[in-house]
């Protein structure tokens, strides 16, 4: 079986105006995460080279904040061009919040292949985890990305206190969008966050992967944040459950598995790594 590996770079961290209860980058909570307006282009390129060395096909440029403005758009485009020049065989993904069709077309011109904007949860549950913007605005940005001609990466976070009905509604919304890839994140509570709920069990997490693949058979199911903590020694069972991709290395504000450990284990299990997108 061939799987896709992706890595992410948090190129603008923290001080986000939004009040998402699950996020340590929100300015509404006090956390000890690193905060910076922009990462040096040389550092982004270095991380991209490391991602490629670690068999990654996708590399995501992530910025904190509600969405793109002119300054941030220019910066993301600069970063994309810098990575493309030095590491030409990576598929670039951008994750920069709300964006218009015109802004997204500019990202595509700069070399961005796919846009990631998660719905996070169901339309019904979303007001319980965020009040500073609407679920509908997130859905519209995904429509904008498709109109701009970008591949779509859209998923969310599970284990925030949502019901089974919420998960079903969420999957139905994803079916409307039919994303190329759909990330699954498992919520891990942080003492500084307003959201404090019991952690998902490994069985629940694997069921979520199975249900997502069943709902979206044509999408690449990517297991991302929380994989190592929630699934522990069972984390590689995700592929039997329908996953076709994982995020390797560190996440936005938390540590991930050492990429070399993932690669060794996956090779032992007989997996190969995608070098192009079909």
Swiss-Prot record:
> What is the cofactor note?
Binds 1 [4Fe-4S] cluster. The cluster is coordinated with 3 cysteines and an exchangeable S-adenosyl-L-methionine. Binds 1 [2Fe-2S] cluster. The cluster is coordinated with 3 cysteines and 1 arginine.
Q: Does the keyword 4Fe-4S apply?
A: yes
| Binding site residues for [2Fe-2S] cluster | 60, 96, 154
Q: Which GO terms describe its biological process?
A: biotin biosynthetic process
- What EC numbers are recorded for this enzyme? 2.8.1.6
* Family matches, as InterPro entries: Aldolase_TIM (IPR013785), BATS_dom (IPR010722), Biotin_synth/BioAB (IPR002684), Biotin_synthase (IPR024177), Elp3/MiaA/NifB-like_rSAM (IPR006638), rSAM (IPR007197)
What does it catalyze? Answer: (4R,5S)-dethiobiotin + (sulfur carrier)-SH + 2 reduced [2Fe-2S]-[ferredoxin] + 2 S-adenosyl-L-methionine = (sulfur carrier)-H + biotin + 2 5'-deoxyadenosine + 2 L-methionine + 2 oxidized [2Fe-2S]-[ferredoxin]
- Going by the record, the broad EC class of this enzyme is transferase
Q: Which UniProt keywords apply?
A: 2Fe-2S, 4Fe-4S, Biotin biosynthesis, Iron, Iron-sulfur, Metal-binding, S-adenosyl-L-methionine, Transferase
SMART domains with a match to the protein in the record = BATS, Elp3
On assembly, the entry states: Homodimer.
Could you tell me what this protein is called?
Biotin synthase
Per the UniProt record, the source organism is Campylobacter jejuni subsp. jejuni serotype O:2 (strain ATCC 700819 / NCTC 11168)
Q: What is the taxonomic lineage of the source species? A: Bacteria, Pseudomonadati, Campylobacterota, Epsilonproteobacteria, Campylobacterales
């Amino acid at each position: 079986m061939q799987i896709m590996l992706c890595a992410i770079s948090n190129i603008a961290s923290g001080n986000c105006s939004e009040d998402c209860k699950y996020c340590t980058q929100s300015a509404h909570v006090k956390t000890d995460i690193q905060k910076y307006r922009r990462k040096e282009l040389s550092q982004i390129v270095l991380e991209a080279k490391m991602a490629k060395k670690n068999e990654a096909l996708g590399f995501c440029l992530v910025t904190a904040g509600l969405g793109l403005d002119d300054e941030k758009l220019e910066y993301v485009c600069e970063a994309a061009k810098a990575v493309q020049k030095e590491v030409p065989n990576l598929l670039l993904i951008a994750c920069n919040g709300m964006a218009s069709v015109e802004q997204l077309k500019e990202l595509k011109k700069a070399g961005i292949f796919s846009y990631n904007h998660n719905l996070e949860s169901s339309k019904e549950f979303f007001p319980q985890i965020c009040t500073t913007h609407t679920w509908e605005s997130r859905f519209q940005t995904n429509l904008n990305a498709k109109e701009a001609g970008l591949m779509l990466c859209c998923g969310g976070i599970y284990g925030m206190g949502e019901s089974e009905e919420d998960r079903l509604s969420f999957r139905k919304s994803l079916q409307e969008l039919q994303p190329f890839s759909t990330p699954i994140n498992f919520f891990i509570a942080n003492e500084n966050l307003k959201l404090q709920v019991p952690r998902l069990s490994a069985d629940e997490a694997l069921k979520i992967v199975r249900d997502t693949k069943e709902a979206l058979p044509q999408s690449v199911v990517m297991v991302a944040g929380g994989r190592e903590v929630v699934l522990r020694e069972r984390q590689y069972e995700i592929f039997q459950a329908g996953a076709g991709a994982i995020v390797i290395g560190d996440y936005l504000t938390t540590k991930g598995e050492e990429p070399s450990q993932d690669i060794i284990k996956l090779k032992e299990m007989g997996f190969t790594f995608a070098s192009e997108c079909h």
